[in-house]
Amino acid sequence: MRSSAKQEELVKAFKALLKEEKFSSQGEIVAALQEQGFDNINQSKVSRMLTKFGAVRTRNAKMEMVYCLPAELGVPTTSSPLKNLVLDIDYNDAVVVIHTSPGAAQLIARLLDSLGKAEGILGTIAGDDTIFTTPANGFTVKELYEAILELFDQEL
C-alpha cells in the first residue's frame, strides 16, 4: 500500500476510534490501532495526531474521561449531547458564567456565538472549562441567563 494511502487509513481508523468515546489514555489508542494492523504506531505518533485533530478529553455518557474529536461535530446544536457538558450556569450584574467539563468551554462558546444577538448574546470569552457571556444591547443579564438555561435544559 502506498504511504499516503496507509496514512489515510490510519487517520480514518484513528477518528473512528475516538468517535467510540471509550479511550481514556494514549496507550489504549496505540493498542487499538496496533490491533487493527498499524504496527508502526506509537504513543508519540498518537499524541501528535491528537494535537493535529484538536482532540480533547471530556466525559462520556458513563462519566469517564475519554478522548474525543469536537471538530468532527461541525457547528453544534443544543439537541446534541453538548448540553451534557454544561455543569453549571450562574450570573452577576455584568456577565453570565458557564462552567463546563474540562476542554468543552470553547465548543460551547462557539455554539453560543453562532446564536448571536438575536438570542441576546453580544459575545463570549472561553477558557478550558469556563465561559463568560455578556448580553447584547436591549437584554439584561438576567434575561440572557434565563435564555441560556433554556438552551441547555437547565433548571432555574
UniProtKB/Swiss-Prot annotation:
Gene: argR
Gene Ontology terms describing biological process: L-arginine biosynthetic process; protein complex oligomerization; regulation of arginine biosynthetic process
Lineage, opening ranks: Bacteria, Pseudomonadati, Pseudomonadota, Gammaproteobacteria, Enterobacterales
Principal location class: cytoplasm
UniProt KW Plastid keyword: no
Transmembrane segments: none
Subcellular location as annotated: Cytoplasm
Subunit comment: Homohexamer.
Keywords: Amino-acid biosynthesis, Arginine biosynthesis, Cytoplasm, DNA-binding, Repressor, Transcription, Transcription regulation
UniProt-recorded name of the protein: Arginine repressor
Main function: Regulates arginine biosynthesis genes.
Stored Pfam families: Arg_repressor, Arg_repressor_C
NCBIfam families named among the record's database cross-references: argR_whole, PRK05066.1
InterPro entries cross-referenced by the UniProt entry: Arg_repress (IPR001669), Arg_repress_C (IPR020899), Arg_repress_C_sf (IPR036251), Arg_repress_DNA-bd (IPR020900), WH-like_DNA-bd_sf (IPR036388), WH_DNA-bd_sf (IPR036390)
Organism: Escherichia coli O6:H1 (strain CFT073 / ATCC 700928 / UPEC)
Pathway participation: Amino-acid biosynthesis; L-arginine biosynthesis [regulation]
Family label: Belongs to the ArgR family.
